Amino acid sequence: MSGYPAEGEIIQIHSYKHNGLIHRVWEESIVLKGTSTCIIGANDKTMVTEADGRTWVTREPAICFFHAKHWFNIIGMIREEGIYYYCNLSSPFVWDEEALKYIDYDLDIKVFPDMTYILLDEDEYERHRKEMNYPDVIDRILKNNVKKLISWIHERKGPFAPDFIDKWYEKFLSYRK
């Protein structure tokens, strides 16, 4: 069993909640880079299944960045008016041959094409923190990772670098021919 999926492989992405219940499943993403510490994937118009069984289809191409050491993942959505980012505060990913998996910890940061951003779902986070008994150590890790993400946004680091999404989107297009 490999510690990560191979480049070009089609995988599912599974998001869970802290209590172990499935939160959301993305049916098909193509792996553009796969290492034991970082997976970069892409999808476009992929089926997403919610925990309650409802489904929807993503509207635009997206580049997805997952890391084994950071408590967040970053989705760059390519739209006509520019790149929007959706950052999920989450556990580092694991790969188990069935899917790329992570725990979603409610807090999100939405980043606009001009690199302004908003922190979302703080109320949901506090509610779930109590309901699911998030340990204090997880609370500290997540709050530190919010600061790290904001720093990355300001520094245009990682997926926020000016050419990052374009570079990986070009690679994604090469698989679609």
From Swiss-Prot:
It is an enzyme of class 3 (hydrolase). The active site is at R24. GO terms for molecular function: magnesium ion binding; nucleoside diphosphate phosphatase activity; ribonucleoside triphosphate phosphatase activity. Signal peptide: none annotated. It catalyses: a ribonucleoside 5'-triphosphate + H2O = a ribonucleoside 5'-diphosphate + phosphate + H(+); a ribonucleoside 5'-diphosphate + H2O = a ribonucleoside 5'-phosphate + phosphate + H(+). Mg(2+) 2 binds at D106, D108, D121, E124. This is Nucleoside triphosphate/diphosphate phosphatase.
